[in-house]
């Protein structure tokens, strides 16, 4: 464990402060009804209290402030949860979609403002968690989620309007876009200087490039280690990219506003709710006609909340048909080219444990560069623990072509960012020379071309929103007749060994995802298949930009910012005076 790691760093959530430091300057205006008599005198004891609207601080405000919230999981559960999904399904009428027997979709009339099209994106880690819970294959877990979200025996079987999700997407498909662009980003960094390059708001990252798909890591970096921000990859995560992809294409092909498309993401991590609430991830980034920004991902729920979603509608997940839906409930995407990309089983390749449980960014980049250097080999060296692994791509002559690393867990992340921290310039005479001599050790992390960084130890299959062992026991116990002994089993505490065994089951389900698919007869991905996927992905990226008329950078890139707190700092007297004047105008004061 790092010597500077304190107990406070082990839990990065701080309860919201009693007094939010964000000033509220839009005070409600006093209601002066026309029937009131201006000359009437009312004694103080007869004055009726005014029902003023409560002050609201949005999650976007919290993300722009480091005063009280550093990990908003507890707050987000009430803002983005299974209850919000059900309330939204009941609050809006279904869009007038006509789906034929063969799955072709058309719109019968103009979609009204109060009507919605519902789309969901599901991560492979969620399917793995569900597969381990009910002891089924990852493929059947996908069918289970499909049947729940858009099948006739799922959410459509209840609610005010009988709403369900029209499309359920696999984020693995969008992940292939991110992998292709990440490999390109690293290649460009290897052939340029260490300084940031590029123009506009999307500046190319410096080496070592740090992955930016983990929102817990991003929140931590923005608030505590701004010196690593120039190293963060510009790419959106698969979740964010799926929201942009769905809303930009559907709004264009169906001629509707992005606000009429409601996008749900089912993820393994509570911090993904933070990511969905970022002001950078709205249609304002890629749409020129957006007056009021609409989030690309409207709601995020976790694997555990998926169980709660089914329980709220009294739906037994194991009782659902574990098979593909009929075309009437699984329509084609309006655009044939996009439909082929989203729902083709040949888009993603089989991944081994070498890829890791967080999308395989690092190993994919290594394989592509290995393909460019015939005869090269990948050497693996374990770090101080199992969550730190260093990789070296070596040539035939035993020369290092590139180095990369994997850092999982905040304990290891702190060691990484400490290595990358720039050395302070000393004022002592002759100190600069000694500092330069020792700069290699302090900047050893800069030898990497790419670092895959994830906040959770073990990767995304161990996300905070995944189904726990006791949750799985309770879910399975509810399938049988409850007895006193059974209830005792579900409430007993599990050991560390049992927890590790449970995580191993989830990992096994994750890595066996493709082995039980319809294409299991196909061999594992080779260099040529990786090259083919690269070509298909670049073709669909070009098609996407042509279809929407947006720049590719605006569709796939995002930005990050340094978050500073005003707590403990001298406040601007002018601002304080202005707020006091506003308070005085409504009869208040300090």
From Swiss-Prot:
GO biological process, one term: iron-sulfur cluster assembly
Entry keyword Nucleus: no
Keywords in alphabetical order: 4Fe-4S, Iron, Iron-sulfur, Metal-binding
Binding site for [4Fe-4S] cluster 2: 214, 269, 456, 460
Sites where the protein binds [4Fe-4S] cluster 1: 20, 62, 65, 68
InterPro entries xref list: Cytosolic_Fe-S_CAF, Fe_hydrogenase, Fe_hydrogenase_lsu_C
UniProt GO MF annotations: 4 iron, 4 sulfur cluster binding; iron-sulfur cluster binding; metal ion binding
UniProt cross-references to Pfam families, sorted A to Z: Fe_hyd_lg_C (PF02906)
Function: Component of the cytosolic Fe/S protein assembly machinery. Required for maturation of extramitochondrial Fe/S proteins. May play a role in the transfer of pre-assembled Fe/S clusters to target apoproteins.
Protein family membership: Belongs to the NARF family.
Name of the protein described by the UniProt record: Cytosolic Fe-S cluster assembly factor nar1
The species this protein was found in: Talaromyces marneffei (strain ATCC 18224 / CBS 334.59 / QM 7333)
Name of the encoding gene: nar1
């Amino acid at each position: 464990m790092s010597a500077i790691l304190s107990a406070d760093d082990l839990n990065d959530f701080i309860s919201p402060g009693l007094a939010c430091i964000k000033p509220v300057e839009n005070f409600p205006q006093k209601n002066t009804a026309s029937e009131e008599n201006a000359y009437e005198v009312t004694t103080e004891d007869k004055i009726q209290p005014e029902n003023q609207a409560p002050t609201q601080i949005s999650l976007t405000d919290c993300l722009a402030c480091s005063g009280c919230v550093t990990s908003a999981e507890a707050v987000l559960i009430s803002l983005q949860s299974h209850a919000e999904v059900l309330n939204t399904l009941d609050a809006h009428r279904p869009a007038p979609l006509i789906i034929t027997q063969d799955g072709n979709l058309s719109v019968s009339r103009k979609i009204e403002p109060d009507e919605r099209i519902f789309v969901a994106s599901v991560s492979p880690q969620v399917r793995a968690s569900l597969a381990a819970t009910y002891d089924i294959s990852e493929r059947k877990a996908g069918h289970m989620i499909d049947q729940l979200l858009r099948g006739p025996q799922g959410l459509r079987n209840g609610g005010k309007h009988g709403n369900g999700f029209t499309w359920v997407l696999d984020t693995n498909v969008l992940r292939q876009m991110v992998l292709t662009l990440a490999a390109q980003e690293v290649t460009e960094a290897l052939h340029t200087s260490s300084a940031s390059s590029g123009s506009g708001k999307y500046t190319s990252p410096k080496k070592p490039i740090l992955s930016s798909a983990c929102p817990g890591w991003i929140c931590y970096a923005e608030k505590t280690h701004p010196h690593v921000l120039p190293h963060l990859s510009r790419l959106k995560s698969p979740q964010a990219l799926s929201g942009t992809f769905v809303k930009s294409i559907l709004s264009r092909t169906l001629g509707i506003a992005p606000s009429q498309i409601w996008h749900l993401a089912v993820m393994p991590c509570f911090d993904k709710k933070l990511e969905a609430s970022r002001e950078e991830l709205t249609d304002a980034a890629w749409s020129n006609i957006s007056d009021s920004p609409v989030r690309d991902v409207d709601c995020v729920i976790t694997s555990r909340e998926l169980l709660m979603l089914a329980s709220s509608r009294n739906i037994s997940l194991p009782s659902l048909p574990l098979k593909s839906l009929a075309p009437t409930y699984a329509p084609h995407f309006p655009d044939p080219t996009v439909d082929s990309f989203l729902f083709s089983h040949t888009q993603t390749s089989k991944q081994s444990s070498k890829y890791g449980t967080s999308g395989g960014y690092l190993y994919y980049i290594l394989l592509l560069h290995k393909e460019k250097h015939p005869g090269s080999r990948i050497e693996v060296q374990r770090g101080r623990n199992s969550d730190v692994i260093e990789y070296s791509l070596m040539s035939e002559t035993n020369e290092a072509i590139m180095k990369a690393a994997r850092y999982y867990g905040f304990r290891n992340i702190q060691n990484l960012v400490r290595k990358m921290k720039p050395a302070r310039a000393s004022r002592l005479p002759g100190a600069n020379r000694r500092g330069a001599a020792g700069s290699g050790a302090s900047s050893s992390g800069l030898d990497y071309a790419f670092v895959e960084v994830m906040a959770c130890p073990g990767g995304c299959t161990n996300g905070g929103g995944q189904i726990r062992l006791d949750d799985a026991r309770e879910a399975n116990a509810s399938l049988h007749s409850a007895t006193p002994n059974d209830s005792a089993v579900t409430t007993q505490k599990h050991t560390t060994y049992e927890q590790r065994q449970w995580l191993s089951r989830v990992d096994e389900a994750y890595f066996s995802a493709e082995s039980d698919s319809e294409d299991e007869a196909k061999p594992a991905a080779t260099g040529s298949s990786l090259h083919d996927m690269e070509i298909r992905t670049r073709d669909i990226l070009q098609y996407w930009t042509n279809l929407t008329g947006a720049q590719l950078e605006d569709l796939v890139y995002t930005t990050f910012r340094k978050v500073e707190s005003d707590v403990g700092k001298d406040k601007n007297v002018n601002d304080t005076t202005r707020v006091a004047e506003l308070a005085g105008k409504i009869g208040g004061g300090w």
